[in-house]
């Protein structure tokens, strides 16, 4: 830990005890802020761990981190929850004394996560066997089950524990976890029937609806919509973006299986959960006598089936109250309000008792199953207390009263045990104990729990007394009994300023953590936790095994009045205190950095409030009352011995004597330190800081000295090693080179001899003398052929073969060509085949004849240039009996004036059509198509020559197409006029009408120009693209 002091200005100190101004709340919070900013969420107060919830995942919980803290002294590594867990475990193993880890803090501070991390640490680092592995799994998997049934979303926390939990983890003599046991405290049953705005009911309800299989929900009579259930819509917050109920359901189902729930147990448990939802949907109406009547029979049927009770008896029990007077049983009808109260009371009782049964069932699964129980010994337990923190809301009720009383008791225990551990350490080290002044909250605990005069006793008395007892009569009795107590105030007892903020139905307690106003509304009902007798009778007769176990028939015959909720809680709290007092405690204080649950946000006001009510400044004061720093002599000497010439580099005597020499050399004043039996105690942090800063300076000079010596030694060793290696390598390499040369020379002579002989006999039949040469020639030719074989059908190259392989070469050449042709043909599909056929036709007609033909070669011919949506529907109707094979937009020039007009050229099986929008302008039967003329230049003009035997027949068609090569190829193929396409140079004659002709003149120019010439001809100027 001391090594981190050099960065204390940036990241703060790792132990609040080392703060110079340790009584300053501002200095405390500033140190928290520095560390939180650097994602250092853990800080010590002596042996107490302060944890700030980061609201994000940090990379500090891996197996590597666990190993780093495993078996390491508490102060040798940075603060961490694993350090607390490991310290407790090592104390358990070495001192054989039971341990407990007390985790406290307000809702959302990270208590549940802290307890999970501790369990995960033990699961990974403790010894393993098959049985131990099963126990580890069950310990870990008990968490999601308890969270599902006992946690809920509140305004401050999406996974708030609504019950207190104390878990004992049992270890055997080898240090392996072999069992566990859970105690639960004060489940918030009122949440089952009511939630504040923005809050939810317990997670299990939403998980069941969201993740339950269709078949399961059908058996339970449920549907997936949470809005259909009265107990789930009070908070208007059924869905939460940060909670995935469907995935959580899968985790819970798997966890139930691991902790030994069979399918029947799960089905019975979920039947009870479903019954609570159905119970919330039971509605009442008043009859003419003002008595309540059930109006939702379907819900009663579902309830009766799920709980295996008689539906008639259940219905009557919800609207009647059984009264036993003078040995006679009377059924008194309930009004609307009383029936609703009875329904909600039953729902709370069912859920609360089921939760207790669930904890009991988990305990059976966690119980140690071994036969060698005696081997566990007395020091075999580590307890984890994860309990609600101090709560202060705008509206505080009975639950907050109990929770805050619990925190008062824990604070009292915390101060007592902390002071005791400090005093014990001082006494064991032979240092005088200096009394510490601190606030003793015993006065507040007595105010709540004192017999006859305490608030709980008064509350019980008011619940039990005959007559009309109300919440206000309870408050009046409080005012009469404890009116003079300095930590108790009501509206009636307060001054004028207090009356402005304190309601008439409220009382205020001045807790150690601050003032809290409690509303007495509901105190008597919640304390009585009353369930009508006839409803108990119904549940005792339930055929559901879990419900039957939860409602024992002995309750009906027991004349003794059951303990009230507050008394039960007080008694269970007293037992918890006894458990904790019997163990060696460790503490984790959890702090919530902001209410918005956002990472990297530090709300100073909220944190100051938590620092105050957790008593952290008080804790620092107690720890600093004597000495801020203490370490064993061996550790202190080992760290700082370099600061004194007499102790550096080694001290041969006792560590205590070495430390005495060291502190004298450092100039410590007598009032700054004390020497104990095994430890040195330093009173002021500044003394330790000065020592640490001196060590940091000394490290540089030591490092320089060591570097110089090490570099010299290292380089010398390196040189000697290299020299030796060089000699060895040279010797070995020279021998190797010599042997290789001799072998290579021998091989070369043999090769040359065989090659010469082969060359001499090369033209003779194969024999011993020429076989090597012929094999080489054959191999050489084949390898040359392999590297230079043709890549395509068009490649006619072929290596020249030697005389002996000419025949084989020709055979190979023919096989290679056939193979390439076969491969090429195999890859051609029908569409590509058609494309090639059209390209072949185009080549036959235009290659080396028309200038713009080369530009068309790499472009694929399109099936049609016009879609059906671009051709007028009337035209398509006229062509209905004919198949349209090709369509292209063209420009048609008049035969007389040469005026250009936009047309569509449509080709069918029998004729070509010139179309203007919806009008058919000219039909040219292929039988009347005598020829097609086109120039040799790069223009796109062509003429379709048509027979013209009378005046009714139109003459030739002069057309222009942007895709002239494609268009003419399509026309030639469709009309079967491949040999009738004339490519002209200079001019083209065309027929205007019977006996009349026109001329189109073509000349080469720089750019395309089509216009009527002065001589009446159509003049076309087109650039030349190649010389052909």
Curated annotation (Swiss-Prot):
Residues the record lists as N-acetylmethionine modifications: 1
Highest taxon above the source species: Eukaryota
GO terms of biological process kind: actin filament organization; actin filament-based movement; endocytosis
Annotated compartments: Cytoplasm; Cell membrane; Cell projection, Ruffle membrane; Cytoplasmic vesicle
Keywords, in A-Z order: Acetylation, Actin-binding, ATP-binding, Cell membrane, Cell projection, Cytoplasm, Cytoplasmic vesicle, Membrane, Methylation, Motor protein, Myosin, Nucleotide-binding, Repeat
Span of domain Myosin motor: 12-696
Membrane topology: Peripheral membrane protein
A family per Pfam: Myosin_head
Start and end residues of each stretch annotated as Actin-binding: 573-595
Positions of the TH1 domain: 850-1024
Residues the record lists as N6-methyllysine modifications: 348
InterPro entries: IQ_motif_EF-hand-BS (IPR000048), Kinesin_motor_dom_sf (IPR036961), Myosin_head_motor_dom-like (IPR001609), Myosin_TH1 (IPR010926), MYSc_Myo1 (IPR036072), P-loop_NTPase (IPR027417)
Similarity section: Belongs to the TRAFAC class myosin-kinesin ATPase superfamily. Myosin family.
Protein name per UniProt: Unconventional myosin-Ic
Species, as recorded: Aquarana catesbeiana (American bullfrog)
Underlying gene: Myo1c
